[in-house]
Every structure is written in structure tokens, then in C-alpha cells.
Amino acid sequence: MLFMVMVFLGVSKNADAKDKYVTERGVNRNTTIKGISVVAKQYEEAGSYKYKIIMKKNGVKKTIAKNTTTDFTTNGKIIYYSAVVKKISSYETKNCIYKYDIKTGKYTKIISGKSYVVSGCSGRYLYCGIDMEADGIKLYAYDLKKKRKKYMTSVVANVLVDGNHVVTSTNSGDAGNYPINFFKLNGTGKKKVCDGSLLKFENNKIYYFIVRESDWKYKVYTCKYNGKQKKAMTGWVKKIPEKYGWD
């Protein structure tokens, strides 16, 4: 059985679209947008490993927060991240999500909860939820204006936002074809688009791959966010081309 962690692999992400948020969930993977670089770095404290969010602007590095999760999202003006408040058990923590204004240096507390992490942002809506590790994320759309949350779905691996839509993939330890779902920005209107593993979502097109378990080969497809206009982009291949979002 082939084991696969359903997250995007890669060293860095770059984006310059106006006010578009870019989300990262890994350690030591830089996200650069509007000349601002943000990264979650591991450090050791009192014999245990923790994480901190570091920003680099005009060549100068600044530690935004220590004892955080590895998840953050930024548009080059704002950084949303999750800080650990206290340990609840050997695998659970109480976390608080903060907003950091890069221009003013102001911190704003957004929402807190058990094992809360940041998964994405559309501007008005922050996508966050409970990290249940192997069982994925229990995802909510948090209305930053009205300060209330809407449950979206569970067992989430990745969240991608483009235009007026949100797409989520399903978390699994094994390579396979699992539901990819579509939502409106406010977290409503859930609809299953297809089965597979999500690669990227841009210009209202979803890129994903399916697995052939007989020989563990992959085929990349694209379709509209509503599941229509499905088209194969590759044949059965052993490695997914990087241009489709898999590094």
C-alpha cells in the first residue's frame, strides 16, 4: 500500500495578484507576496521543538510570533496565524488565531479554540478549524465582519480559494481518489465536484489527479469549479508534472 500525505509539497510560493491570500502549512517553506516573505521556522526551547512565524521585509527579518503552528495565510498586507495558548493533552492544544497588520505592526485576536489552525482567506472570510491530525481539519468559514463562524465540512486536507469559490480536498494517509468539494465563499452551498486529489485551483478551474492502484500511476484532470468541462491533461504517468502544482 502506498502511503501519501495529502498536502502540497514544495519549497516556496510566490503570488502577486491584488489582495490574493496565499496559504502555507509546512515548515521552512517561504511564501513571498508583494515583496514580503513569510515562513514558519522550527526552533528549540526548553528541550522541545516549537515553531515561529518570521517575516522578511526590505531585507530585514522580524519574528512575528513564537510558539505557533506551522499554518499561516498572507496577502502581503495582513498575516493570519495560529499561536499555541496552552497544552491540553499530549496531542491537543488550545490555540488562538491572530491577525497581524504588516504596515502598522498591530496584532488583533480573531478566534480561539482547541487545536485551531488557519487554512485560507478570501478577504472577508477566514477559513480555519480544528486540526484533527490524521482525520484532517474540521473546517469553518469565519466571517471577519460579523464575527461568526459557519461549519463547512470535515476530514479536510487542503483549502484553495479563487474568485468567488472555495475548494477543499479530503485528507487520507493512502493514495486514492477522495471527494473534492466546492463551496461559496461564506461556506455554504457544498457540492461534490469530483473524486481525486487536489492540485490547484485558478481561473475557476480545478486541477486534480486520480490514482490507478494496479500500478500506482497518476492522471491529471481539469474541470470547472462546478465539475463541468472535465478534461484529461496527461496520460497515466509515474510522476505528476510540476506545472500542475505538484513540486
Language model feature labels by segment:
Residues 39-41, 80-83, 126-129, 166-170, ...:
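Residue position within the beta-strands of beta-propeller blades
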